[in-house]
Amino acid sequence: MVKQGKLGSVSSKLTLYVGILIVLILSITSAVAYFGSKENSFRLLKESQFKLMDDTLKTFNIYTGFKRNAMTVLASQIGHLDHLDEDEIYELLEMTLKTAEFGEVFFASEQNAKTYLSNRTSLSLTQLNFKTRPWYEKTKQEGKLIATEPYKNATDGKTVITYTVPVIHNGTFVGIVGGDLNLAAVSDQILMMGRTAESYSQAISPNGDILFHEEEEKILSKTTLSENIANAIKANPHLLDDDNDETLFYVKGNDGKAQAIMCDLTFNPYFRICTITAESSYSKASNKILFQQVITGLVAIIVALILVRILIARNL
């Protein structure tokens, strides 16, 4: 009986010591695996968010690049007309309106002080004094295409940006062509490309104005999130640098919860394309990995202890 008691005591001690060793080994390996998986999960989520931002940015640049090119072509075509014939001007305006899908296309003529519209009407200088408009003065002065900041069109109340290009005829400046891009009309097309189960995209101005939204009345409005994003970039402009790898930053959202943000510039510096992911998406992925590691570790420890107990008992 004494011998059996001693053997049982030795067996228990060996099981305890080996068990502690196994727990330590499995704990260390599980911790290493957890932190490795957590880092990998964070990297994948970050890469996914970056790709979403990049895809949205490319879509925006391609879409607006087509509009800019259409205005440049129109300016060249009008500049090559022999006598700046009104019928030919209207035809070119109509064609550009249809092919480039602008809300309105116009030609502001320096020679006769008239603004020709794509609906085949014209405005006199008393109806529209384009010469006093900032976009006209800036385009004439710089001699190149410009894009205005978003503004509400006085004629229909739509929020637009206007692309303008100087028209040169026989070496002489004769006016400016312009096209109005309705932001509400393109919001769905741009935002559709920037949405996943975890993230969505937004275009935000340097002042925190929302520039794209499915609901037209919310364009040019501000939210807590949009203002916080704008303020974070003002405080650290390097967040927009292409060569900055640490472009992910966090701000409070409209609900007070942390949001993971990435932003980049477009051709138009007034537009910043940002992707937004709830910070909880990153923490949920980490928590899921931790839970899996804990369950796996506990099962492995229990199985190992049982096997050790059996092996020790058989050999004593």
Language-model-detected regions and their locations in the chain:
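Short hydrophobic alpha-helical segments used for membrane anchoring or interfacial signaling
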Residues: 105-112, 200-210
